[in-house]
Amino acid sequence: MNLNLRRTLHATTVALVVGVALAACSGDDASAPQDGSASSEHNDADTQFAQMMIVHHEGAVEMAELAGQTSDTPEIQDLATRIAGAQQPEIDLMTGWLNTWGEDVEAMDHAGMDMGGMDMNGMSQEEVMAHMETLEGAEFDAQFLEHMIAHHEGAIEMAEAEIEDGVNEEATSLAQTIVDAQTAEIAEMEGLAAAQ
């Protein structure tokens, strides 16, 4: 065989193998939903879960950001950073689902839905935030932990309802992730509260 032809065939084969290998490693699965969107199969439970959990997560992010600015306790600051860091991407993910499903991002009737603990210890999110903004030091930390524990318990209740009633696999999977993560965070917060 001609040396030039052999080199050309070898180079072509190497290029083909490298191209196939790169395509296989790219992780671009055409069957996977793109841009964080869930498959379009969903029911009312999935829609309500996403709509209400977005609102619920926004409240947690708001409290966590306040704790990050107000608390002097490194463990509380670290926890607050992790809460905001986990929940903001979940808000974005659920917003993408609702858009994919052709559903409103905001729930039409907040009054008619179980907010799953949105009222923390008898206080609305606005009342909690207004109260917490007046606190500092150990008093702030204690109130933050108390309210965030109640908030997490509400999220777990909402997520468990989604696991039971939802049909969208990605939504029910996120709900299980929320149950697992927030159960662990409640245990962590209870430990921090006991140590105060």
PLM features: what roles do these ranges have?
Residues 2-13:
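Bacterial N-terminal signal peptides that target proteins for export
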Residues 14-18:
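Hydrophobic helical h-region of N-terminal Sec-dependent signal peptides
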